[in-house]
From Swiss-Prot:
Composition-biased stretches (Polar residues): 584-597
InterPro entries: AB_hydrolase_fold, Peptidase_S10
Glycosylation sites (chain numbering): 432, 444
Record's protein name: Pheromone-processing carboxypeptidase KEX1
GO process terms (BP): apoptotic process; proteolysis
GO cellular component, one term: membrane
Organism of origin: Mycosarcoma maydis
Cytoplasmic side: 561-657
TM stretches of this protein: 540-560
Subcellular location: Golgi apparatus, trans-Golgi network membrane
Protein keywords: Apoptosis, Carboxypeptidase, Glycoprotein, Golgi apparatus, Hydrolase, Membrane, Protease, Signal, Transmembrane, Transmembrane helix
Length: 657
């Protein structure tokens, strides 16, 4: 089916959607280059931001309840053979995806001075894929909706994302599934992946199902990726206690452990009778662990407790992790600046309130949904339909810990079997020569445990998390190049995926300025990449020069060969152009003898001159060139000598070429 012009579609539907140009963001205030502290009002990154409707249009031309979702779109720095789009969700429920954009997988971070700084090459997920950060459900982050009209269920939230995407592909038709249907999947269209963390473990499977089940899916969904997600209450509730023991914070003989173990037992008994996502008795487990770790620090005015997002850290009570990461306060200040809001096209009329990380009203409305089953029940059908699923977990998290996420994967039944089998054991995963974690794949499902990472994997392990998502999406950055092609990476016994190494295959190290340095050369990866680019240009130029020289050589040889052939032809028939045959009478007199019996050589020479057109074979080459291209009238005059017969001479104009 041919694609309609987006304006025609909008006209037919009566939807007032702005042109894509109106969403363009030319720059962000105080976005600094890595090597400079000067304000960067413009930058090489292609970026768009703004609002699109989340609910159907009503009679007044506005969406129901005035629901609009805010989005931030970052384009890829390097484009693979098949383009990719990652749609990013944060959790909560009700937490803004600016967490992901500015602290985890986006292109910049806070610089500690109130501005922004670009992340190091290879750390942002938009290196090889476009990323769409989405504030959803309506009311989250910069999104807005009428008061008391918040989204109240997971299916509703999913439908609103699908409605948003239907409008999105009208503004940006290159992302539409219609492109792939029209022109084929090889190189045409865009592969779409849903990704996020925490409570997004509920959002994402529901949204994936809504896309797949849509009568006309707006995008071509290929996979979903959930980090430290809450997806399976039966597998995950209670693993908080196991994590406390695994991390050597408690022992099984401690009083705290025994107390919480009783709560875990009561929780599991409740889970056996319920199919709800959140159960009060089970929520008591984490609350009790937090209370048990809360202490008054000597010399401090308040209390501290465990950071539920990173067990290696503590936080002030009652935040217990809500103040983390440490750049969060600066992010609040930045996103509340009027110049930043203006640059991002924030609607001051409908969203006048200051940005907050998590909207409590949105969260409360979503928690009223007690009928939607846990999202884990949607995964088997998605997997069987061909949608790839990645479950990954930072191993230092407590609230949605790696033990629970891995157990959820192992308990899952799909493709005619349960969990992983012995034929596909977990493999060690290495990035930049360091053990990054474990990797296991079976029947479209992949589980990755990330060593040394917290609840927000991208905060602690940006290079590793990016390598993970690139592998999952099947991008071959050996062909695309870019910074990640410089970082050795492998799973199991496969060869390292790396384009350039130094010092006999050494791995990149971290320099004083934070840049990765190639051993054996002392150069940063950026310097090595620049040298590689120049070498590529040099090699391409050398190849072109060789081709040119070969062509000139062949041309010269052909020219000389042609000239030699012309000389040979002239030696045979002369320059007269046409050879007049001698008469039999003339030939009969061609050989006479003198009275003493000797042959008359003078007569022979005279006869030879007549046969070759009146000139000797020793004529120089220049005369050949003088006439070979000349065209003119026939000259029938007799110029062969006093006694010679008339011959036809070559056509010429009398002028030289």
């Amino acid at each position: 089916m041919p694609l309609l012009d987006p304006r025609e579609v909008l006209l037919r539907r009566g939807i007032p959607i702005p042109a894509a140009a109106s969403f363009h963001v030319p720059g962000l205030p105080d976005l600094h280059a890595e090597s400079s502290s000067s304000t960067a009002l413009a930058h090489p990154l292609q970026m768009s931001a703004g609002y699109l409707p989340a609910r159907p249009i009503e009679a007044d031309g506005q969406p129901k309840d005035n629901a609009h979702l805010f989005f931030l779109l970052l384009r890829a720095r390097h484009v693979p053979a098949k383009r990719k789009l990652i749609i990013w969700f944060n959790g909560g429920p009700g937490c803004s995806s600016f967490d992901g954009a500015m602290m985890e997988v986006g292109a910049w971070r806070m610089d500690g001075k109130g501005g922004l700084v670009w992340v190091k090459d290879g750390a942002s997920w938009n290196e090889y894929a476009d990323i769409l950060f989405l504030d959803q459900p309506a009311g989250t982050g910069f999104s807005y909706v009428n008061t008391n009209a918040y989204t109240k269920s997971l299916p509703q939230a999913a439908d609103e994302v699908v409605h948003f995407l239907e409008q999105f592909v009208q503004v940006y038709p290159e992302y539409s599934r219609d492109v792939e249907l029209e022109y084929g999947s090889q190189g045409s269209g865009v592969d779409v992946y849903l990704a996020g963390e925490s409570f997004a473990g509920q959002y994402i499977p529901y949204t994936a199902k809504a896309i797949v089940k849509s009568p006309k899916p707006p995008v071509s969904l290929k996979g979903i990726a959930i980090g430290n997600g809450f997806i399976d209450p039966k597998s995950q509730y209670g693993t908080e206690l196991e994590t406390m023991v695994q991390k050597n914070i408690w022992t099984t003989s401690s009083g705290e452990y025994k107390h919480v173990a009783g709560l875990v037992k009561a929780c599991h008994e409740e889970l056996d009778k319920s199919n709800q996502r959140e159960i009060g008795k089970c929520e008591l487990i984490l609350q009790t662990i937090i209370a048990s770790t809360t202490t008054k620090t000597q010399g401090a005015s308040g209390y501290t407790c465990i950071n539920v997002y990173d067990v290696r850290l503590s936080d002030s009570s009652p935040a217990c992790g809500m103040n983390w990461p440490t750049t969060l306060p600066a992010m609040y200040d930045y996103l509340r600046r009027p110049d930043v809001r203006k640059a991002l096209h924030v609607d001051e009329h409908h969203k006048p309130e200051a940005w907050v990380e998590c909207n409590a009203n949105v969260g409360s409305a979503m928690r009223t949904d007690t009928t939607s089953p846990p999202s884990v029940q949607l995964l088997p059908e998605l997997l069987d339909s061909g949608v790839k699923v990645l479950l990954f977990a930072g191993e230092e998290d407590l609230i949605c810990n790696a033990i629970g996420v891995q157990r959820a994967a192992e308990n899952l039944e799909w493709g005619g079997a349960k969990g992983f089998d012995d034929k596909q054991p977990a493999q060690d995963w290495y990035v930049n020569g360091t053990h990054a974690g474990t990797w296991r794949t079976a029947r479209n499902l992949t589980y990755v445990g990330i060593k040394g990472a917290s609840h927000m994997v991208g905060v602690d392990k940006p290079i590793e998390s990016h390598d993970m998502i690139v592998r999952f999406m099947g991008i071959d950055y050996m062909k695309v190049a870019g910074p990640n092609a410089l970082i050795p990476s492998r799973v199991g016994n496969e060869p390292d995926r790396v384009l350039i190494t130094g010092g006999g295959g050494g791995i990149a190290q971290i320099g004083k300025d934070g840049s990765r340095v190639i051993p054996g050369s002392g150069k940063t990866e950026e310097e090595v990449a620049e040298e590689a680019r120049w070498r590529a240009y040099y090699d391409a130029g050398s190849f072109a020069l060789m081709v040119l020289l070969i062509a000139v050589g062949i041309g010269t040889w052909l020219l000389l060969r042609a000239r030699k052939q012309r000389r040979l032809n002239r030696n045979r028939i002369g320059r007269g152009g046409a050879l007049r045959l001698a008469t039999t009478t003339e030939l009969g007199a061609s050989r006479s003898t003198t009275g003493n019996g000797d042959t008359d050589e003078t007569s022979n020479n005279h006869e030879l001159e007549r046969l070759v057109g009146g000139k000797h074979v020793e004529d120089d080459d220049d005369d050949v060139e003088e006439h070979i291209f000349n065209v003119g009238d026939e000259d029938l005059s007799d110029s062969n000598g006093e006694n010679g017969p008339p011959v036809v001479k070559a056509r010429h104009t009398g002028s030289q070429r």
